[in-house]
Amino acid sequence: MATAGITAAIDDLVISRIDEAITNNTLVQRLRKKVSSLWKDYDAHVSDPTAHELLTMPAALADLPPPPPPTDDEINRSFYATALPSVVPTSDTLWGTASYEIIGRAVRIASSDKAPRLILHVTDETIRLEVPTMSFTLASPLSTGSLLRVTLPRGAIHSSLTGKFDERCWVRLLSTLTKWSTPSTMVTSDWTLDTTTGLTKPPVTGFNARATVKDSAIVMWFPAPDIATSARRAIVSPMSCVFE
């Protein structure tokens, strides 16, 4: 009996010492607080799953994190936008808001439903144009030999480097277009007509484009449906051509 009492006393002493060590241990206390905090967050999430989202939303624009630093490309654009006129990049990418019309026998058959942007990649020797998808509501029947007329006014052209009209870009564009007398190379020209019998693919008037300058505007002629027919709408897929 005496031995059993001594053993129990030793066990109680050891357990009390262990509890005391755990209680006074800094790491154990941090773990207990962390577990308690996690349980509180879990209970709050169960009661209102979206509460934490409201807490993390910025109260004002000033609370938003700062934007990332500019890339090398953005720095180069800023440099060209403020550089002296003698500093000119070897190529320009321009965009402009043009008007698009289908012309047949010197008569305007239709204008585009929208005025999408025309993209021009200009170098010292070539111009590559990218014409987006367009749709036309036809006011008159199509005729053979019709063409797509694209008119790009001088003030509607902007440089991708500055975002504004740039006289140097305009001069470069004119000099490149008027340097060569041959038509462009047409890469794609795909039309679709919406007729009473369904969608059809008409033949087109050639596979190249021509450009002239008239009244401070660039006028370009592209292939169009080469067919005499009545249609409700005409759709042209994206076109790309190169003047070289």
From Swiss-Prot:
Domain of life: Viruses
Similarity comment text for this entry: Belongs to the aquareoviridae NS3 protein family.
Protein name: Non-structural protein 3
Annotated source species: Aquareovirus C (isolate Golden shiner/USA/GSRV/1977)
